[in-house]
From Swiss-Prot:
This is Phosphoglucosamine mutase. Its EC number is 5.4.2.10. It is an enzyme of class 5 (isomerase). Catalyzes the conversion of glucosamine-6-phosphate to glucosamine-1-phosphate. The active site is at S101. Activated by phosphorylation. Its cofactor is Mg(2+). PROSITE patterns: PGM_PMM. It catalyses: alpha-D-glucosamine 1-phosphate = D-glucosamine 6-phosphate. The gene is glmM. One of its GO terms (cellular component) is cytosol. Binds 1 Mg(2+) ion per subunit. The keyword Metal-binding applies. Mg(2+) binds at S101, D240, D242, D244.
Length: 444
């Protein structure tokens, strides 16, 4: 059955436009409450990032859950992985995150975690969608859910993050820049690294409701690179608005993406005898990652794009390390979902145990030039089915002669066609990507 509301990462859109409106979000809270109340514990955690619309949507969700008879535990600004972790430790029936991740402030979204801290199964999302088609009916007054705020959520999560860094190691003597993108990690990430001994220069830690992901954070790592060079820091880390993505910068200002982070973590796990199986990447993962892991004898598999699909494949194979080149890194030995802070701590562990700078650790992987072009399209159209597009793709693949890849896919969160071409020569793949993008544009 086709989904009406849930995309690859929950419900998302522009604030004030359906479905990100107060009335719909209240009904979504009610529908989720109706489904979840059948499963046991009648309490749900709610966290949010720093968007100004989070206040409005939090109140709407709270009202909907209360109408269904569930208790809402409000945590305020909290990274997505923190909600996943705290949902488990509070033994709640579910966790809800109000965030649009790396998108601008005027977007927002709602995503859910199940009691075990993983994304909701498809069948539960479909059950919530089915309830949304029914009229909202409030439970009896005596059965209404209450709401309460907890003040120590950030402290609990800080201690959890620190626990994923070996107790016999220290970040003493390390100078690092931490860019929180004016997002949900602003009051957490700097404390984690400072308390482990690092000298921290914090940027992107002054959210005003409108500046999330604006020229800072993992989607704009140039700001981090500039600060690392300016301060002569050893490295830098940048998170997105909800803290589930990580991008790093070494002391030369080189920007290290999710594929290179996966390589560093996997190589360290292999070296220390902790690697279980292989590594799961996505269809967008750089060929350089696959070849570098192959050289180390580490198996590599590609899942569909989206951290939920990476996690599904990791569980199917019993592997513990996976992620996306965008910086979603999942370390199942430590947590249940993508966690930017925890992933950064795994890289810092590798730096400490190998006694090598970040620049040296990443040098074992040589990335292929990869060009991504986004083409906006009208909803309801399918330009990927056009003969001209398919012919151009076939032509490009023939020219690459097995030393590169072409990938076209629809975004799961925006009306975009993503055209990716990868090969050995940057100008060649840039030209190829533009040729295909032009055919996609012409198709509608």
């Amino acid at each position: 059955m086709a989904r009406k509301y849930f995309g690859t990462d929950g419900v998302r859109g522009k604030v004030g436009e359906y479905p990100i409106t107060p009335d719909f979000v209240m009904k979504l809270g009610w529908a989720a409450g109706k489904v979840l109340s059948k499963k046991g514990t009648r309490k749900v955690l709610i966290g949010k990032d720093t968007r100004i619309s989070g206040y409005m949507l939090e109140s709407a969700l709270e009202a909907g859950l209360s109408a269904a008879g569930l208790k809402a535990i409000l945590m305020g600004p909290m990274p997505t992985p923190a909600v996943a972790y705290l949902t488990r430790t509070f033994r709640a029936e579910a966790g809800i995150v109000i965030s649009a991740s790396h998108n601008p402030y005027y977007d927002n979204g709602i995503k859910f975690f199940s009691a075990d801290g993983t994304k909701l199964p498809d069948e539960v999302e479909m059950a919530i969608e089915a309830e949304l088609d029914h009229e909202l009916k409030c439970v009896e007054s005596a059965e209404l859910g209450k709401a309460l705020r907890i003040d120590d959520a950030a402290g609990r999560y800080i201690e959890f993050c620190k626990s994923t860094f070996p107790s016999n190691l220290s970040l003493e003597g390390l100078k690092m820049v931490v860019d929180c993108g004016h997002g949900a990690t602003y009051h957490i990430a700097p404390s984690v690294f400072r308390e482990l001994g690092a000298e921290v220069i914090a940027i992107g830690c002054s959210p005003d409701g409108l500046n999330i992901n604006d020229g800072v954070g993992s989607t704009a790592p140039e700001a981090l690179a500039a600060k690392v060079l300016e301060c002569k820091a050893d490295l830098g880390v940048a998170f997105d608005g909800d803290g589930d993505r990580l991008v790093m910068v070494d002391n030369t200002g080189y920007i290290i993406d999710g594929d290179e982070i996966l390589y560093i973590i996997a190589r360290d796990a292999l070296r220390n005898g902790r690697l279980k199986g292989g590594v799961v990447g996505t269809l967008m993962a750089n060929m350089g990652l696959e070849l570098a892991l192959q050289t180390l004898g580490i198996p590599f598999a590609r899942a569909k794009v989206g951290d939920r699909y990476v996690l599904e494949m990791m569980n199917e194979k019993g592997w513990r390390i996976g992620g996306e080149n965008s910086g979603h890194i999942i370390c199942l030995d430590q947590t249940t979902t993508g966690d930017g802070i925890v992933a950064a701590l795994q890289v810092l562990t590798a730096i400490c145990t190998a006694e090598m700078p970040l620049a040296k650790l990443r040098s074992g992987m040589n990335k292929f030039p990869q060009v991504l072009v986004n083409v906006r399209f009208a909803e309801g159209r399918d330009p990927l089915a056009a003969d001209a597009v398919q012919q151009e793709v076939a032509k490009v693949e023939q020219e690459l002669a097995g030393r590169g890849r072409v990938l076209l896919r629809k975004s799961g969160t925006e009306p975009l066609i993503r055209v990716m071409v990868e090969g050995e020569h940057e100008q060649q793949v840039r030209d190829m990507a533009q040729r295909i993008a032009q055919q996609v544009e012409s198709a509608f």
